[in-house]
Amino acid sequence: MSDKKEFKAESKRLLDLMINSIYTHKEIFLRELISNASDASDKLYYKALQENISGFSREDMAINLIVDKENRTLTIADEGIGMNKEELEEHLGTIANSGSFEFKNALEKGVSDVDIIGQFGVGFYSAFMVADEVDVYSKKYGEDKGYLWKSDTSDGYTIEEAEKATHGTTIVLHLKKDTEEEDYSKYLDQYEIERLVKKYSDYVHYPIKMDVTTSRKKEDSDEYEDVVENKTLNSQVPLWKRQKKDITKEEYDEFYKAKFNDFEAPQRVMHNTVEGAVSYTSLLFIPSKTPMNYYSQDYKKGLQLYSRGVFIMDHAEDLVPEHFRFVKGLVDSQDLNLNISREMLQHDRKMKVMANKIEKRIQTELENMLKDDRDEYVTFFKNFGMQLKFGIYNSYGMLKDKLQDLLMFYSSDKKELITLKEYVEAMPEGQKEIYFASGETIEKCDLLPQVESVKSKGYDVLYMTDNVDEFCLQMMRDYDSKTFKNVTQGDLDLETEDEKKELEQKTEDNKTLLEIVKKALGDKVQDVKLSHRLKSHPVCLASGDGVSFEMEKVLNQMPDAQGVKAGRILEINPDHDLFKSLQSVYEKEPVKIDEYASILFDQALLIAGFSIDDPVEFSNKITKLMIEASK
């Protein structure tokens, strides 16, 4: 007897997408099921090596495809490690834990069904794109009982004991009926199956076998007869072991999509064979888009690790540095012990040698991309540039020399992303610092009053729009001996000597007024002063030399926020008509100074991107002033 169990919510949603899919690449189901069969075979082979199981040969293992046109079934059978009842429920009843978080996020963000299938419609569930019923017979290696997992809808599934002679997993797909839009019968055609295996799974290092009917002449006769032979459909040569010159872009793309569960072709491929004290082959990919889960805890960095073509582990983290964690791929070395553990890898000298060379290879690839294909590098940087910045920040600046020339920031002058080297080379004579402004968007940076002032001097301003930007620059300290200067922080020292003297005189003349405004604002500000930093704007906020305004915002968004607050200095434009109005109020109606001071401070807060304490009160004060002005 078997009890029907319901799929978990995320699994049901994904199954609904599969069952009702308009996805045009339904044929990938075979790629995914063969890939699973290969993984199961790898696991058993690895177990046999670790436990010295006698009488076990990898050459005896195969993946078998069985076509039954009469019953409209396609079967994929392996002789791998198999699953017991608990594992069937864990692996087939729910989305793998590593995928559930980002799947939920994708649904919440309203990502299209097609894109969701492209991201998550991989592995076993893809079978439901072509089948309306799926039977999975499995028996785990070393155990006596076999089980049947069965589902014909997205509502649920059953698991019951079943006879199975050998270990491994057999998946029987009951294909959907043909429709006007879809021809499911083609997956019962031997030539179509051969084509799909050749296209997607040729590199699988277990023979993929199928009974194939061919026609040949009878002996001593002109008549033909049909002959059935069990044919191996794949070459079994791993892609990375072939010569680069013999591999097409399409082959690299299809391998990447199949191996690393990506819907898109990679942006860049790095295929290298290294001979020396440690010999290895690496096949590395830079994805063309940022994975949905890239900035979540679910994302796992690292490369697949092989030894002499035998799979060892999925995420060898030590092979790729944190600042290049976006790189996917694999490494195959004949110099590694097959029984090496994850703990031993951390201290293995050969692993460290490979890791250093792989890091240099990625670094060189990015440098060449920036030099030879600017547009492609800009695309890459928009996807993964933040990771390079985090690399400098997380290393406390230790990686500055390696990564600084790969960074790009938006230029107020060029209206595009530029490198720090390009900024410095374009600096006019007399400019001593690299000016930058921080904000949520380029548009908000562009509107800052302080930016206007710096641009009026003919200086370019770099816009920092990522949360990590200022923290990264803080760790770098300088570039090419030029220090970084936040235009909203401290004294910019852009005035001529005459302008400085003029400002000193105006400050002295209005000393009492400024003191009254400061007193009115109390502990909201550190200081109130006149400034030549402003051109067309009446007021702005500047921060002291400690935490900047954007750093304050970022730090206060963190879970353990301590209420960090940057020092606020209210700067007033002495040449603006509003200041003249303030002077007039001070002379004629000094009791109103407190109200004017409050309005000016709230204005400055809004310009700097902060919220104000009481928007209603601010609105009422503005309304009152407008009414008084009309009288």
Predicted regions and their residues:
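GHKL (Bergerat-fold) ATPase N-terminal catalytic module, capturing the glycine-rich phosphate-binding loop
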Residues: 1-190, 195
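GHKL/Bergerat-fold ATPase module in large chromosome/replication-associated machines
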Residues: 116, 134-156, 176-186, 191-631
